[in-house]
A protein has these predicted regions:
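Glycine-rich phosphate-binding loops of nucleotide-dependent enzymes
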Residues: 2-271
Length: 271
């Protein structure tokens, strides 16, 4: 008898209402181990609101969501992180006055065992743990080719490198699920290509399931296995990239019914 697969993330009729507005309604999403899933839709469709629900920033007013079979409703943001969900934001949130290395080391703090006394008086055990944490952080920086910037302040990194640092720091939390909120926003083509390779590396090396919000359709279509399309807070369609690209409802709602007479209904609009 085949073993039943348990989704890493499963939302069931997930929703939230602000006053009389249903910002997200009846959303059902499943993500399995190792999958890279896209979440697309027009601006204001509710994509980031879904991320805020999953990470505990907002509390659902309807439905539920589960991480590896564990019900997550009602958990605080730090409890969600401890459970294994990490995210990046549309606006980069780094400790800009700390070095690149320190930004990643901070994410390892939950694994450190030294107590307050050892930290204050800088005991040998403290320095041992500090060195081990620095090495783990450096190993992550190497994966993203950021080790050469380790001693620079985070605010001095080029924009694309700051995005990669944010992902590296998220990886340090030992997550079970990674949420990427428009990671390619503001990037030039070279930086976007570097981001694409880094995401592919994450999947191949760590098999971390990823839920990606992105307006760069060429990026989404080239790396995602499945895509959910959100419109007015509800799932409009889901399927493989080629199915989404040829879905008439999606083309009208998001990809754009542009110049159909001249170009055969091009589907490469950025929404």
């Amino acid at each position: 008898m085949a073993e039943e697969r348990v989704p890493v993330l499963e939302t069931k009729c997930l929703g939230i209402q602000f006053g009389g507005l249903k910002a997200v309604n009846d959303v059902n999403i499943e993500i399995y181990p190792g999958e890279l899933i896209g979440l697309i839709g027009p601006n204001g469709a509710g994509k980031t609101t879904i991320f805020n629900l999953i990470t505990g920033i907002y509390k659902p007013t309807s439905g539920s969501y589960m991480l590896c079979g564990r019900r997550m409703n009602g958990l605080s943001t730090h409890q969600v992180v401890e459970a294994g969900i990490a995210r990046t934001f549309q606006n980069i949130r780094l400790f800009k006055k700390m070095t690149v290395l320190e930004n990643v080391m901070v994410a390892f703090n939950k694994d450190m065992k030294c107590n307050l006394f050892q930290s204050i008086f800088r005991t040998p055990f403290f320095w041992k743990e500090e060195a081990e944490t620095a090495q783990k952080a450096m190993d992550l920086l190497k994966l993203f080719k950021l080790d050469g910037f380790a001693d620079q302040l985070a605010e001095n990194l080029p924009y694309g490198k700051q995005r990669l640092l944010e992902i590296a720091r998220a990886l340090a939390t030992d997550m079970k699920l990674l949420l990427l909120d428009e990671p390619a926003a503001g990037m030039n083509p070279v930086e976007t290509a570097e981001l694409k390779e880094s995401i592919k590396m994450l999947r191949e090396k760590f098999r971390i399931p990823i839920l990606l919000i992105e307006h760069d359709m060429s990026l989404v279509m080239s790396i995602c296995e499945r895509i959910y399309v959100l419109n007015f807070g509800e799932i409009l369609a889901s399927g493989k990239p080629e199915e989404i690209a040829n879905n008439k409802d999606v083309i009208e709602a998001y990809l754009g019914k542009e110049d159909e007479d001249e170009e055969g209904g091009g589907n490469d609009a950025e929404g």
